[in-house]
């Protein structure tokens, strides 16, 4: 089936009388309740469950192997190839399945807040709550924009269609397939809404570099003087917490592009983790979960319909989706100038990386490519040994192109705009996990504030003997002793041993970048 035939079949489907186009939030909430897809919370949010898939399914994600894009994709475990004929057969089956439904829901909008770089998208949903989710997460068009809207990419999401691996060429019943030639994302077998969001992010990660725009998995905010800061970091490093600052306005919490004009948010909403959420800890997120927000896998108290954010029975990965406009302190539209500061966040459970260090351009590229943090493996079974995790460019699951392309773009932009870059360790101090303690949030906030406000630009620094990083000798509001990891360990020999152990893990991980300019590792990596 060629692209024309596929397009015809889709337009035939979208003309059916039972297809609802561009419903409002209130209409979608009514549909969700009427169809028994979810329940209303005491604030008017919609609470839903996603069945057995409570997170992304990276092993079920494919990119169609097509002549026009084949040479540009970094094929492997992240970007698994699928034959065009396999995709087309499955596409046909999914559309036949959707033709038999009583109701379908279509949203048209945009990915990318910069009008010159945005991608017009449409999303076709089997579930009303999924359509509400994309309405809140992507950029909603004005009436004029809707009248001229020509979708450049279509997401078709049919969670109740289960693939048959023996027949359909998939690994399981679930599948997330991107075809760049057919400008289509096909999702089935999973109800987890994050797949729709991250599929479009993967699409933008492929398309934006063609326009000289760097796509980034980061949060971004702007100060009173218009100074922009970016925060990169893997899950659990403090990206959302540290970029939410009463003195700075939020541009976005997760996905951004950096063009020759500056920074823009790719999305129109937030998809915030909400396990253990409280108004005291995260007032902006807590208060944003109002009418029309979507709560995924959050348990409600039966009588009051009040969410119990501390209950991780279904998953620790509970989520809230809401539009950016639900937050008071935002930049609207979500565009800003070039960043003056970039912060890489890591939670080092080995307790050896400095709490803050200034990076050279080569070190910035090295640590961007490394994407290091650590996770605590199996603590519930009494295994307390931390595990080093490396996720290239702080977003490996969403990068269709070779990582080096993104790193080189970052390096060029840092040099061009004279951006200061810091590595901030929000993890352990005074010893590894189990011996030391977690870095105090008040100290981390003080360090980030000093970095972003330019207070560390001319400060005296000391070189870390193992990682070669420039550690500020003084940071306002932080004891000097805390700044140098070896000073916080009682056993200096144990510190050196552990630091060398982590340095070796960095080296081993970096071997996969054999084709990169050797000066990046030589000037950017550990000294030992």
UniProtKB/Swiss-Prot annotation:
Residues that, per the record, bind substrate: 56, 192, 198, 319
Primary localization class, coarse: cytoplasm
InterPro entries referenced in this protein's UniProt entry, alphabetically: PEP_carboxykinase_ATP, PEP_carboxykinase_C, PEP_carboxykinase_N
Pathway connected to this protein: Carbohydrate biosynthesis; gluconeogenesis
Gene Ontology terms for molecular function: ATP binding; metal ion binding; phosphoenolpyruvate carboxykinase (ATP) activity
Coiled-coil portions: none
Pfam families with a match to the protein in the record: PEPCK_ATP
Residues reported in the UniProt entry to bind ATP: 198, 217, 233-241, 282, 319, 444
Cofactor: Mn(2+)
Record's keyword terms, sorted: ATP-binding, Cytoplasm, Decarboxylase, Gluconeogenesis, Lyase, Manganese, Metal-binding, Nucleotide-binding
EC number: 4.1.1.49
Residue numbers binding Mn(2+): 198, 217, 254
Catalytic activity: oxaloacetate + ATP = phosphoenolpyruvate + ADP + CO2
GO biological process terms held by the UniProt record: gluconeogenesis
Location in the cell: Cytoplasm
GO cellular component terms given for this protein: cytosol
Free-text function comment from the UniProt entry: Involved in the gluconeogenesis. Catalyzes the conversion of oxaloacetate (OAA) to phosphoenolpyruvate (PEP) through direct phosphoryl transfer between the nucleoside triphosphate and OAA.
Assigned protein family: Belongs to the phosphoenolpyruvate carboxykinase (ATP) family.
Protein name as annotated: Phosphoenolpyruvate carboxykinase (ATP)
